[in-house]
């Protein structure tokens, strides 16, 4: 007994020491130059040469629609538009004209977005043009403080904004969103400040209102400049100081309030229907207090949560593949939200409206199974392997990372205070900490995030299915049910290798170099031609494809649909003696992605891998070609699901679908090989 007490004491002490070691800040990327001007504007500068002669710029404004007054609803978004309609250095439309003449395109190189809490302007600029390089920083400065907000231009823009709102209003997804968001925001200020605003205000607001919003919230202490690209860092810093230092902070500026979404008791249920929604879904949102990631202990918790998300997603994916599964697709995940919250989200697509209750029961059962019995050791080990693959890829490709991929880390640091690490830290930290994350730690996350408090359950579907779908009372009953007969997961593991016998291969009968394009062409004795081309686009990636002439054009009309669907069915059946689920488990921790296809004139396969996993990828390619696994249950399940999806798609017709189908019918004279598939085609 004394020894047991000593062991427990030793364990407790070691745990405290371990926690203390990680209770230190997460280190930011030391290559990033971070500074703050005297007026309060913060800036982030990182030299990165991928792509060469290009720079990513962002102006981040810590202000969005949530800060609007009652009479300003929609003006944060309106102001974003107005910044392209006249500034001090670029009157009226000269800004867009200047950038387009410089070879930049609106949307790809030049854009902006307004959300509830922030507004972000973006530019992608060539750095090999001295004039454009300097002008880019002037553009950001103009957006931040020198918008002209001319009354005539405001009146012109009203129609554009109203048309944008009208177009969204005619879109089913937008209509659903406008009903869904106030529910998720629980009648907080967020629910009353959707960025699109109110039509009557957009039509008639006086110019002084938008000027006031601009002066109140576009101010130095609420703005940051982000610059990442192929440039001289000192030159960029000098340009930021030159263009932004003259901006003055307003006197008596309003306080930037951080709003929160209040909690609600228990589970709330809703039914949101629309005439143009083709497929009904079940969605559930568990709202949880925001967890900030500031220390290395927090970062370790983030990794455990990443593993949790991987495992729970795989559970649902595997469940959807089972014979007679009540849902076609399902996802669950834990992630940041807004208003001081994180969210545990569930989305499920049942086979049809009649099967909605069964789909919900299956999802609730799976959540309860995980809470009751936890994950398995095998699930955790595979998730760790997959996580490490991603970290290793980032580490090996760190000098090939695109500038755009760095930007969001700096934006989130400014807005949320989250750290921006580099690939070296992420790799070293994972090597030290990943293996030590236990099943108990991950299972504790399950109990933390899967709760019935402050939860919203929704059925989003077609008005035509109203009578077939559970009403709000029935949905609440389904969500509260606890199945007493649940059992722990029985894993379907891979017991055999991809290939039980490795083929002998064949000889190379000819070799030819094509120096103009850097390709070596090999011809094998069996007639297969292989073209090899070394590249330096990536450090740790091999991309491959193979094709032959043929495709569905070789098949008779009677066999056309079988040929068209063949590759999809093959991809779901597995290879050799491995089911698709077993194959996924066998490939855990490996980068060996292979797809097959049957086109109109060709068929083939392709994918990507790494030098380390090339052997596995080649075996998988060979297995798909020579040993595709036919599983009658998989075929039956796939065809049934496909038929249901097609039936749902024609049951609820949207204007876009009707237009597209009509164009196809006219262009191709209603030929079944070129027009959208119908439910009855699956029976052929």
Where does each model-flagged region fall?
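M16 family metallopeptidases and their MPP-like homologs
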Residues: 46, 51-68, 75-76, 93-142, ...
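Hydrophobic, small-residue-rich alpha-helical packing segments that form membrane-like cores
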Residues: 145, 153, 158-166, 170-209, ...
